[in-house]
A protein has these predicted regions:
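Feature recognizes metal-dependent phosphohydrolase scaffolds
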Residues: 1-591
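Histidine/acidic residue-rich metal-binding segments in metalloenzymes
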Residues: 590-642
């Protein structure tokens, strides 16, 4: 009966033998083409500038395509200029107009070169697929240009006439921008984000806008994504958590400009309650300056401490509601000796580094004050009614999952929880035990329930609490550690108290036999399949390798986030899977800032601003100057020591 239902659905699209045969022929022909290129990124952590550049440049592949297409026909400077135009067409076109380079000749040459690159990057796709990626306004024209026969003199005249008409009708800029965007889209056929779009970096919202413009993207949820998803549902612990991390890393632009979260009540509360407290253990880590919402570090520290204390209270309330989480050891506020100024953690007493907790009642440490209750209620309303946040989170839901099987690759962010003996670890939800694939399937359904169930559904709160557990719980597949020592990091000096033990998965998965076990669990063949994983930064500088399990496992968190780069020694990885091979691109940390101070690239004034800023960041200065025209680059090099 079920087969008959499927056949009836197919009959709507293919009502007769001819229609079905035509589609079979089409699909068989497509199978003969090379597969599209897939790109895998992990742990973006709000680093929008780095990610957007990697995405638009296809991690350097577009520059390679330019070199392959033109060889020695154009200079290195022209290659760089063309590449930058493709990556950032709006910026490049503005510069061309500002510098009076936007002539008919420049437009004609640029369009010709872009069409050549389009032909190169579209060669592995069907004409139909390429047309679907074209901007509708220019689809017919672009289709004609990239399929013209240059050996036919009549067609060559036709080709030249099309370009001349584009320029004469003053549509050159729009057409060039359309070609640049098409090249970007054709170079990356499928984009996979292996979790953690949010937290630490300055503007996860800009990353989300970029992802939402992309034609084919999927997301495997990470623990930081889950925390923001939980915050969007109104889970108080998740709201406190994302606020705490954002304030800790000075991400006020994300909160206020990106998502319109009203932080004024929090700042007023913190300034009043912690007026005489320097909050030195809560000073923000300033990796990026705020552009729109600069906040004094002293006030930020008070806000940081205020929201952290509220977080510990509401987390404790969740733990009390759910003894099945087995997280009673995290009830640190209840284990403080306020007279002695100590806290007992796992049976050992430690002195508190910060004893100023004016809102914590020793008789009922987990109870919120009336002011705290009002504050967290207002913050909750701000999160639930943020149009941009809710729009982004709905996209994370609609394009995301706990894992994905695609082209013999198994994608997930954190881990598949395991025991020391190599068996899949178990977790009980509502009286039913889950492990392995079944655990991830159940959690995926539960995550959706937390967001999409109506507010008056009595079970919704249970699912919302589970979102917090997934952020930091000992058997959470997106977290992968036995505990999260946030409290210890703020209040205990002894680093041993803050130790977080990794799930046995991370040791076992370095062996091929356990990778094979996981692949079989998810229904993938052992031969030719791979696991693609993120979450744990690969410390390349300490000799760690991103490739494990005899080539079966790729860990691609290489430190795109600035906060991790001192640990990894690099600036991240991109995994690229094309029709020929699976390749891992390693992104080096910059040592120099190299500027082309030339006509049509950067002026001396622009070059000076760029290089001065680079030197403040500790980068060396290099300059290409006066190779085309003597515009003052050599003098600038002498002035700044480039």
């Amino acid at each position: 009966m079920r087969d008959l239902a499927y056949l009836r659905l197919l009959a709507r699209e293919y009502p007769n033998v001819q229609a079905a045969s035509s589609e079979i022929i089409n699909l068989m022909a497509i199978r003969g083409l090379p597969k599209g290129t897939e790109y895998f990124f992990s742990d973006l952590h709000g680093e929008y500038e780095a990610f957007v550049h990697l995405l638009r440049s296809a991690s350097g592949i577009i520059r390679e395509k330019i070199s392959e297409t033109f060889g020695y026909v154009i200079s290195d400077e022209d290659e760089i200029a063309l590449a930058n135009l493709i990556y950032y067409p709006e910026r490049g076109l503005r510069a061309a107009k500002r510098e009076n380079r936007f002539t008919e000749d420049w437009q004609r040459i640029t369009i010709y070169r872009l069409v050549c690159i389009c032909k190169e990057v579209s060669s592995k796709y069907t004409r139909s697929k390429v047309r679907k990626k074209m901007p509708p306004a220019f689809a017919y024209i672009i289709d004609e240009l990239i399929h013209v026969d240059y050996s036919d003199e009549n067609k060559k005249v036709y080709y030249d006439e099309i370009i001349r008409s584009i320029i004469d009708s003053e549509m050159g800029a729009e057409f060039i921008e359309a070609l640049c965007n098409l090249i970007q889209n054709l170079t990356i056929d499928n984009l996979h984000i292996i979790g953690d779009i949010f937290d630490r970096g300055p503007r996860a919202d800009i990353i989300m806008e970029e992802l939402m413009k992309f034609h084919d993207v999927d997301i495997q949820w990470g623990n930081h994504d889950i925390s923001w998803m939980g915050a969007a549902t109104g889970n108080l612990a998740c709201i406190c958590n994302v606020l705490r991390i954002a304030i800790r890393y000075n991400c006020f632009d994300l909160l206020e400009d990106g998502y319109g979260i009203n932080l004024r009540p929090l700042s007023m509360f913190a300034a009043r309650v912690y007026r005489d407290d320097a909050c030195e253990h809560f000073m923000p880590k300033i990796l990026d300056e705020n552009i729109y919402d600069a906040v004094d570090p002293g006030l930020a520290a008070k806000m940081h401490k205020a929201i952290a204390v509220i977080q510990f209270k509401v987390e404790g309330q969740i733990i009390k509601r759910h003894p099945e989480y087995n997280m009673e050891d995290r009830l640190h506020l209840t284990r403080i000796n306020f007279e002695k100024g100590t806290v007992t953690i796992k049976g050992k007493e430690y002195p508190l580094t910060d004893k100023k907790l004016p809102t914590v009642d020793p008789k009922d440490p987990l109870k919120l004050t009336k002011e705290e209750e009002e504050l967290i209620h207002n913050l909750c309303m701000s999160f639930k009614h943020s149009v941009n946040l809710q729009r982004h989170i709905r996209f994370v839901y609609s394009h995301g999952a706990m894992y994905k099987c695609c082209n013999s690759n198994l994608l997930y962010h954190g881990c598949i929880p395991m025991k020391e003996n190599g068996d899949f670890d178990e977790i009980k939800f509502n009286g039913i035990i889950y492990s392995g694939k079944r655990m991830l399937d159940y959690i995926e359904d539960a995550v959706k329930m937390a967001y999409f169930l109506p507010d008056d559904d009595t079970s919704k709160e249970w699912y919302k609490d589970l979102m917090w557990y997934l952020w930091c719980g000992p058997k959470s597949p997106v977290y992968g550690k036995d505990n999260m020592a946030t409290f210890e990091g703020y209040f205990v000096a002894d680093k041993a108290a803050a130790k977080e033990n990794m799930n046995p998965y991370y040791k076992l998965s370095t062996k091929e036999e356990f990778c094979d076990k996981i692949l079989r669990e998810f229904g993938l063949p052992v031969e030719g399949s791979h696991i693609i994983n993120g979450h744990v930064p690969v410390k390349l500088k300490d000799g760690e390798s991103p490739i494990k399990g005899n080539g079966k496992l790729f860990v691609i968190d290489g430190g795109l986030a600035k906060s991790y780069q001192p640990k990894t020694g690099i600036a991240g990885y991109t995994l690229i899977f094309n029709s020929r091979h699976l390749a891992l691109a390693e992104h080096k940390l910059a040592e120099y800032c190299d500027v082309f101070c030339e006509t049509g690239v950067f002026t001396p004034a622009e070059s000076q601003r760029i290089l001065t800023a680079a030197q403040k960041l500790g980068l060396g200065a290099k300059i290409h100057a006066d190779e085309i025209d003597p515009i003052g680059g050599s003098q600038l090099a002498g002035q700044i020591g480039a």
